[in-house]
């Protein structure tokens, strides 16, 4: 991914966040993007797309919010008859087609997944992920809290560590996995979850990583460092994950 590709991806993400926040859509960082915020205060350095998940009930509100971004950004929605790969994609109008086969969207994009809910849990509506256990108690997710992501703050699950370790054991800090999907070409590099895994500590002097210290009042100080060089420090206040 080139520097200009990354800038375009981040500007698309920033536009999406601003639009969804303004429309009061319930959404939060998801998948590798949440891992990126927790571990790097931004994208995973070797990732090539960004992900959010939003309330299935907010689809109409989201369409109205994101349509305001046209003509600078375009929203792809799969056909209503489609029963899998249900996520939407937001991409810049200045992005160029690069996939090996013609696609109705362009890279870099932001993937928009959906969750449904009952009184106690939420779950990813995509069958593949639901079957893989992407189901969480509301007490893990709500109330949402804002987390750093580059130069913006974005909603995240209340207990983001428990949320991640439900489906990505070791993802918070200890293990770093190579990507298994090439989003630029829209094709798998490796089977899902079959990437090379190394201890993240092997990369501490190469990429920025977040380190945490808890204070006496229950706050958590997050320091973003490369080796011994501190890039930024953020204080995260204590929060009660009530499920509401």
Regions found by a protein language model. Give the residues of each.
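A short acidic/basic microdomain associated with nuclease active sites
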Residues: 29
């Amino acid at each position: 991914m080139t520097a200009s590709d990354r800038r375009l991806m981040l500007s698309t993400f920033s536009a999406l966040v601003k639009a969804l926040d303004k429309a009061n859509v319930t959404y939060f960082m998801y998948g590798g993007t949440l891992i990126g915020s927790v571990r790097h205060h931004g994208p995973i350095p070797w990732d090539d797309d960004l992900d959010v998940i939003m309330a299935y009930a907010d689809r109409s509100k989201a369409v109205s919010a994101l349509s305001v971004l046209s003509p600078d950004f375009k929203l792809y929605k799969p056909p209503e008859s489609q029963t899998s790969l249900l996520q939407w994609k937001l991409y810049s109008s200045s992005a160029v087609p690069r996939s090996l086969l013609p696609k109705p969207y362009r890279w870099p994009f932001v993937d928009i997944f959906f969750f449904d809910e009952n009184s106690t849990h939420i779950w990813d509506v995509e069958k593949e992920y639901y079957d893989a256990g992407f189901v969480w108690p509301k007490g893990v997710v709500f109330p949402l809290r804002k987390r750093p992501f580059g130069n913006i703050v974005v909603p995240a699950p209340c207990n983001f560590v428990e949320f991640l370790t439900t489906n990505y054991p070791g993802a918070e800090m200890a293990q770093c996995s190579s990507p298994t999907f090439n989003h630029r070409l829209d094709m798998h590099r490796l089977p899902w979850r079959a990437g090379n895994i190394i201890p993240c500590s092997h990369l501490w002097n190469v990429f920025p990583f977040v380190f945490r210290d808890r204070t006496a009042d229950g706050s958590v100080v997050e320091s973003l460092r490369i080796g011994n060089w501190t890039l930024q420090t953020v204080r995260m206040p204590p929060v009660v994950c009530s499920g509401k």
